[in-house]
């Protein structure tokens, strides 16, 4: 009997694209940002990464705050750092709320359905591992018609730890101790590095990174 093969996917950013979030900023503020010499895509990334960082640290502090709430105060920071004298006058609260709510509408990354189909055809069992809240991320998968069974969907809140704590990845590896292959797929370098240290073979940025125990 052939040894089992498993691949664990990060979800938001890896299987689910940030495009809806980026498009919301472009739609409501793109022209205005360009008029002040601020590249919209740079601003989008600053807001996204700033919000994600604040959310991560709030989880570590055991005071988790949803991204959609965290993004509102974070939104004004890169505006101020870009030279906008009155960030709260530069953009209306309604625009910030619209952008924050767009994070609920994230869709599938192009090619992910074919990717998972080919993996299954080659004998892989697909798992999801997310640091996002379970209901929201499962909602993304359902809306995008990405089929990952509920028993294969693991949220960090179910483990009692958060990425990139080693306990998260060790928890996953314990689910298939006799696997012939265990892979981890993520677009975030910090996530991939933590998985590698825990014993996974990585797939990230189109490169295979050797397993190291």
Describe the predicted segments one by one.
Residues 1-7, 113, 117-120, 129, ...:
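Asp-based, Mg2+/Mn2+-dependent phosphohydrolase catalytic module
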Residues 2-49:
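Active-site neighborhood of HAD-like aspartate-dependent phosphohydrolases
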Residues 14, 109, 210:
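Active-site loop signature of alpha/beta-hydrolase-fold enzymes
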Residues 24-28, 46, 73-77, 98, ...:
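Alpha-helical elements of Rossmann-like donor-binding domains used by nucleotide-donor carbohydrate transfer enzymes
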Residues 31-38, 81-89, 145-149, 177:
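Short helix-capping segments at alpha-helix termini
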Residues 38, 62-66, 159, 163:
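Residues at secondary-structure transition points
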Residues 41, 46, 52-97:
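A metal-dependent, Asp-based hydrolase signature
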Residues 64, 68-69, 87-127:
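Short, acidic loop-to-helix structural element flanking the phosphoryl-transfer center
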């Amino acid at each position: 009997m052939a040894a089992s093969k498993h691949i664990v996917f990060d979800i938001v950013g890896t299987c689910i694209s940030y495009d809806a979030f980026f498009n919301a900023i472009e739609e409501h503020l793109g022209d205005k940002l360009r008029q002040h010499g601020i590249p919209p895509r740079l601003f989008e990334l600053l807001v996204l990464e700033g919000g994600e960082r604040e959310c991560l640290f709030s989880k570590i502090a055991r005071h988790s705050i949803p991204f959609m709430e965290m993004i509102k105060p974070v939104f004004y920071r890169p505006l101020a750092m870009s030279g906008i004298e009155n960030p709260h006058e530069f953009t209306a609260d309604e625009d910030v709320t619209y952008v924050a709510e767009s994070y609920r509408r994230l869709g599938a990354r192009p090619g992910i359905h074919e990717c998972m189909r080919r993996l299954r055809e080659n004998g892989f069992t697909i798992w999801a591992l997310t640091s996002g809240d379970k209901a929201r991320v499962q909602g993304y998968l359902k809306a995008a018609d990405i089929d990952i069974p509920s028993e294969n969907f693991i949220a960090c809140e179910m483990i009692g730890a958060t990425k990139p704590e080693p306990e998260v990845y060790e928890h996953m590896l314990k689910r298939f101790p006799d696997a012939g292959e265990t892979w981890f797929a993520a677009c975030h370098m910090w996530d991939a590095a933590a998985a590698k240290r825990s014993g996974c073979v990585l797939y990230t940025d189109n490169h295979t990174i050797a397993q190291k125990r």
